[in-house]
Amino acid sequence: MFDLIKKVPQKCLDLMERITSSGGQVFLVGGCVRDLLLKQSSKDWDLVTNLPYSELYNLFPDGHYHGKSFSVFTVDGIEIATFRGKGSQSTSLEDDLRHRDFTINAMAIDINGELWDFFGGQKDLQNRVVRFVANPYDRVQEDYCRMLRGCRFVGYLSGQLEEESAKAIVHFSDAIQVVAKERLRIELLKMMALSDLESAVLCMQRSNLLKWILPSLNECQNRIVSAYVTNKDLFIHSLDTARAIGQHKPLLRLAALLHECTPFTASENRPDERHKHVETVRELLTGMRFSHDELYYVIETIEKLDFSLYGLSTIVDLRRFLSKLGMPLEDFLDVYHAHLLASDATEAEFMAYDRMVLDLRAIRQENSAFSLKDLKINGGVLKKMGMKPGPVFSDILDACLEKVLQEPSKNEEHYLMHYARKLYHQHRA
């Protein structure tokens, strides 16, 4: 195991050496140990020690405390905690590890590179098993968010929950409602960034968590959409769509999971239902404390999936579409392609998509206007022309944009001023 310690950042080893030299015990713990064993890079390096915080402060006067549930001492970005047990500090590494969430996260490495594994974490890691440490019912009750974390780690390992751990989550699944919504948001976005998103989502489904975390997705189970070639249910369709998107776009994956009630093939004649679904998603994400920009992005994605490729038959149609697209073009292309894959689209549909991609990218390269801010005139120009401000300004500028979308060369100040004056006089007539 000595090779493991060679992968630890030098600044972390220096802290461990200083604590050891002062007579203290110190260990690397948690996710960084798990990542070392998996031969993966780690972002966070956490230490535990038997030294009280007063001694840590004497050793590292530049450090500072933080943390709500218990104090954590941070030095140069490295977190150092004192051994903690049930409800208080402890003098035992084993007791500290006993109250961590999963066996795969309850291992430690000392400065000599020796692995301390009291609960079989290494074996579980090798077998891709997610198991609560010791009594699963106790671990869950210490922090109900651990249930969602358990499903995330199932996806992280492409593994499975240990049987008793799975039973504990099902038993307490309703309690996920008391977890702070901000924490659920963080866990959900981490889950969306997994390479094996499917295993994590299916774990939520089997554990009765999905109905509380993503209720609209849960309700899509066994709902068949006859317009799909394979007649798959909306739950599987949504999951397949999300899986087909790169893991580096977690928010786009989330939008794909939540688009299920508004695919154009199923709902083009049900505008009321589409609107209701969008509002349900808005309410869900607002409750989870998603930011305004995140919320807008997800809603925009859902709404933009609700159209037919065949509705964009001309270059002007494509320009209009780009003018109303409130998300990066490449993200839209990614999610729409994923949607087609999940729908088992026909060869003709994929050919139409490929043509649309080429046309949209070519149009995007045009030195043209796609929004009001791109026009060579604005409300200030209209005022200088002697026009009286009012709702008519919006109508005039919208008409100017439509003119430019049809003829990009018309985005010229002199022409647009002349065109705007004509529209203004027509309005007053």
Residue ranges and their predicted role:
Residues 1-429:
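Catalytic cores of the polymerase beta-like nucleotidyltransferase superfamily
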